[in-house]
Every structure is written in C-alpha cells, then in structure tokens.
Amino acid sequence: LGLADRYRLNQRRERWAASARRLWEPGLVSGVLALVYLLTDPSSADLAAQTFRVGLFEHQGLAAWDNLWFGGHHLPGYGFILPLLGSLVSPRLVASVAVVISALLFAEIVYARWGERARIGVVWFAASASISLFTGRLTFAIGVALALGAVLALQRGRRGVAIGLALLCPLGSPVAALFLACAGLTYAAWGKRREGLEIAVASAGMVALVSLVFPEGGSEPFVLSSFLPAFVMAIVAFVCIPKQERLLRFGVIAYGLLLLFAFTIDSPMGGNATRLGALFLGPLFACALWQRQRMILFLLAPLAVYWQVAPVVRDLETVQAQPSVHASYYAPVVDYLRGVTTKREYRVEVLPEAHHWESAYMPRGIYIARGWQRQLDRKLNPLFYESELGPGQYRKWLDSLAVGYVAVPDAPLDYAGVPEANLIASHPGYLKPVMRNANWTVYAVENPTPLASGAAELVKIKPQGFILRGLRRGKATVRVRWTRYWTVERGQACLVPTQDGFTRVRVLKPGPIEVHAGFTPWRVLGGGRICSHRDLSSDG
C-alpha cells in the first residue's frame, strides 16, 4: 500500500474504532434489557393483539381480511412486518432486535450532531426504548427502528435510502410513520426543505394509501389528563431548549401541533400521540442541555422518566399474577363453545378483560363479536362507550352480529366491558346460563339471529370468507361485514353491502355459493356490486 492508501485505511479504522466506542453503551443497555424482557416474558395487553395477528399469519398467510374479530375487518392497516417476521421466529424476538437497532441508530444520529455531549441522552434512549417492550408495543418498536433509519439516512445525505425506509415505516407501524412525517416537516422548516418534505410525504402518504386500500377507521381516545402533561412538557421543552438548537425547537413546535390535532380531532392516532414525546423528549433534553443547562435538565429529568415508566408499570400491574393471561384459563370454555357452535354456527361475545388476552386465545375455531383494537371497537360498537346500556339496546346488538352465546370471565374487565357485565348481572330474560365453571359463565341467547337468513343458509364461516347453500332465487342477509374484496368463487350470486355494513347476497341460482376475501387491485376504488360472472352483473 502507498502512503496515501495507508493514511486512508488508518482514518477508516479510527472512525470504526470511535463508532464502536460510542455504540457499545447503547448496545449493552438495550441488549441487556431486551434479554430481561425475553426471559421474563410479560403478558402485557398490547401483546395479545400481536400474538393473535402473528397466529393468523402462520395459519392464513398474508391476508387482507379476518372474520374472527368484529364480524370481519381488514388486517393490513395495523402493520405487515411483525406478522411476517414474527411467524418466522418470534414476535418478541423481532421487537427486541428492533429495539437494539433503534438504540444504535439513535446513537449515530445524536453523536453526529452533538458529539460527546450526547452520551447521557444515548444511554437514556437505549433504556427508555427497551422498557417500552414490556408494554407489548412490538409493532411500534419495528416502526421506530425504520423511522430512525430514515432520519440517519437523511442526515448522511442518502435520500434514496431515506425515502425507501420512509415508505417501509408505515408497514411496520402507522403511528411511528406519522411521527416520521412530523420529523420530515421539522427538517423542511429547518432548511432542508426538499429532503424533509420527501420524507414527510413518503411516510404520511403511505399511511394514507394503506388506509384507503384497507379502510378501518375509528378513533383512539385522548383524554385531557393525558393531553395536558404532554402539551405542557412540549411547551417547557420549547422554552428550555437553547435558541441555537433550531432544529430541535422546530421539532418541539411540530410535536405540539401534532398533540393539538390528535386531541381536538377524532382520529386513529388519538392518545398514541403521547408516545413520541415520552420516548424522545427526555433523551433529546439530555443531548441539548447536558453541557449548557444541567440544572434545568436535573429538574425536568424526573418528570420525563415518570412519563416513560408509568405506562410500563401500569401495564405490568394489570397482568401481574393473573391466571387469565394463559391459554389454560380459556381451554375449558373454548372446548365447550367449539362443541355447541359446530352444530350451528354463531358468534360468541366474550366480555373484554383488562389485559385482552381473550382476543388471542378465544378465536381458535370460535368467531368472537369483538376483538382488541380500541379504535375499531369504538367505531363498530359505540354502545359500550356510552353512559348507559339498556337490555333492548344490547339485544339488538347481539342480533346484529348473530351472537348465539355470551361468555363472562371472572377476570378483571376492561372499562368497555363493565356496563355489559352489569347488564348481564341483572338477568335479562333472553340470556340463559348453559355452562359454568370456576372461571367462566356461558349464556345462550334465546332465539338467536342466524349468521345467514333469507334465500340462503350458512354452511360454514371461514376466517376469510363463508360458504352458503342457496335455497332459492332471491336475497339473503349474511351477518359478515362488507368488504370490497369479496369474490364469488363458486356458485351464481351477486353481493352488495347492506345499510348497516353487512353483506347481502342475491342468489341467482340455488346451490353452493362460496365467497372469499382476497386483495385485488382493481377493487380498491370499487363500490357496491360484486357478481360471480360478468354476464350476470346486470341481473336484477
């Protein structure tokens, strides 16, 4: 090697050595905490939803639709990446690796900006990102890793990589993608207008596209007691961060506006908006203030740490020593319900527990009327979030979803299950107890509404479709929610949505009718009518 080559090689080695010295601390902190998470294996509430979705992918593959929850709903809006990777290894392991990657990416970003001043913030972020695993927000962990990768690529001038990661981020976590869009707008306001807007448009645009193609909607609650502390922290951050830290100050402004938007306008984001501040504000405080205003940092740090730790403690307390987080708790009632619903298929209403593991363990051959996605539950089942729940209103809801059985656990309930439990305890005449053990009481609904009525009867409901037997020409109502992706794979029939969002089948010829939901691009903007053959589409 020549002298110039040796010099360049030595410089490269020195950079690698310096990078290794900087990264070992966040790598160690996040790695140890991730290992503790994997060993302790806490059954937090959000993990129940991830477990269900990974199980669906293992059995159904990449699906657009699921009938096991809510009478039918679209799947991809909640994230593609975790079900895919989690089915190959383990969802917990995938998220743990993502957290370590996030800690290393954050370190690279802030060391490049603040140098050694960032050390405390780097270690802080590694710890806070890792403890968020204990809340079960696994999709969010993947989304944060992709978002930080996009920010690092943007910082290093690799626009193509940044845009690619911004497009991937919503497939990991829509919430993290909207946070990335917020970061992109911050960069644009700071001066990197084109690069920042590219990131913002890519991430937010992909969220909008997924929402358009696989609509779900609904709103996440954002109560005043959650909004005020977050908004006050944003104001305090803006006041305390030195004026020369323009990028950081622009970011705090963007975050404050995001909080206002999420609080004043009903949206799926809702209270999830606080996650960005809880995860990043404290570590960024430390980076910006450590060598300039340590006293302010020492005053604010306890508040920021409490903001990060309190949700983790609350979630762990919910599942602590609860037998109802284990599959064995559900086995007797699942066996009973499988037996009775095999004879004639109905949905089962399972009162939602505080930790929501019923949504993972009950839908094993059983189609439940609700599930664990707060936004969708509020949209489809608003009666459980209103002040009073009357017996007539409840009976109407049971009939709308063709519920034949109601299962009541002895475990602590979610707040959206308490009014329902109180009503059932008042013994409405249409509910008859048919099974009871130490943990469960199952009620049969008197004269339940069938899943299919009219000109066809139900043969079988499947996770992504249903099979009917057409009895005569005419209309049948199927109490499975409508999707534009229905396809008539067998038989002669046309499908249209009902006014209340379910599926109406017009039987054109008696006999077997098989309907399946599969993604087809030309149906994205489709509307009302789906027929088995083109030449039947004009049939009245």
Report residues per predicted region.
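Signature aromatic-anchored transmembrane alpha helix within multi-pass, membrane-resident enzymes
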Residues: 292-311
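Membrane-interface junctions at the ends of membrane-embedded or membrane-associated helices
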Residues: 2-18, 69, 154-162, 188-197, ...
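Membrane-embedded helix bundles of polyisoprenyl
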Residues: 30, 100-109, 117-155, 159-188, ...
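Start-transfer (signal-anchor) and selected internal transmembrane alpha helices
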Residues: 1-35, 539-540
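Transmembrane signal-anchor helices characteristic of membrane glycosylation enzymes that use polyprenol
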Residues: 19-47, 207-210, 306-309
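Transmembrane catalytic cores of multi-pass membrane glycosyltransferases
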Residues: 41-49, 59-63, 143, 164-281, ...
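Extracytoplasmic
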Residues: 311-540
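Active-site lumenal/periplasmic loops and adjacent helix-entry segments of GT-C-fold
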Residues: 34-115, 119, 124, 128-139, ...
